[in-house]
Amino acid sequence: MKNIKKINICEVCDNSELLSVLDMGDLPLCDDLIPKNSKKICREYPTEILFCNNCYTAHHKYQVDKELLFPKSYHYRARFTADVLNGMKELVGSLIKNDGSIKGKLVLDIGCNDGSLLNEFKKNGAITIGVEPTGAYKEAENNKHKIINDYLSYEVAKNIVKDHGKMDIITFTNVFAHIDDLKSLIKSLRELIKSTTIIIIENHYLGSVLISNQFDTFYHEHPRTYSYNSFKHI
């Protein structure tokens, strides 16, 4: 099928013996929202989950192109959800409590959306940079953050370092699991970090998904669901 990549090997540890554990049939993209009176029909994509019993990572067998998942017209905005905003404020507060002042620190938020998290960093004196491929980047720019309107890649990472230097803090708030090319992501991170860089990853956890039967988190925007063991391999 066009615009789909089929996974046969674990993208974390390269194990070729993946077990099919859940098939939910064909489902539409969760953010493909259509007006009530529109005659357009949502396109559906196969939703089958593969499990790696070596590193304990769950994969979507069929991964949809990122341009379809996160187009310029992407609807989601972080600022519309009070719990999300409160969580961002708590994240920055916890960072300051544990590691001290962030005044003058270079902060990079990957998938910064409308800049809500960057706003919290900026309030506390940080120098704020974001990477955001969707139209939400304009709202972040309006709040005086430096925004790269693109998907994260090695070339984007090199340009960020060229323009600003190595990062002090890098954040992924419910974004790490959205990035399809894991090897490219890790290569990009290696370019962006120095020995003292703090990387913050907020992510749903495979253990909780299994214990609480959170199968509704297996949608196409999450090509992988990670366990603690996944990150040990990464």
Features from the language model and the residues they span:
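Conserved class I S-adenosyl-L-methionine
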Residues: K103-N113
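N-terminal juxtadomain amphipathic helix
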Residues: K2-A82
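Conserved alpha-helix/loop element of class I SAM-dependent methyltransferases that forms part
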Residues: L85-K103
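Class I SAM-dependent methyltransferase SAM/SAH-binding core
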Residues: S116-E155
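A conserved beta-strand element that flanks and buttresses the S-adenosyl-L-methionine
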Residues: D168-T171
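Short, glycine-/aromatic-enriched active-site segment of Class I SAM-dependent methyltransferases
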Residues: D32, I201-R224, Y228-K232
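A short glycine-rich, Lys/Arg-flanked "PGG" loop and its adjoining helix->strand segment in the class I
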Residues: K183-I198
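Short amphipathic alpha-helix with an adjacent loop that forms part of the alpha/beta core around
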Residues: E155-G165
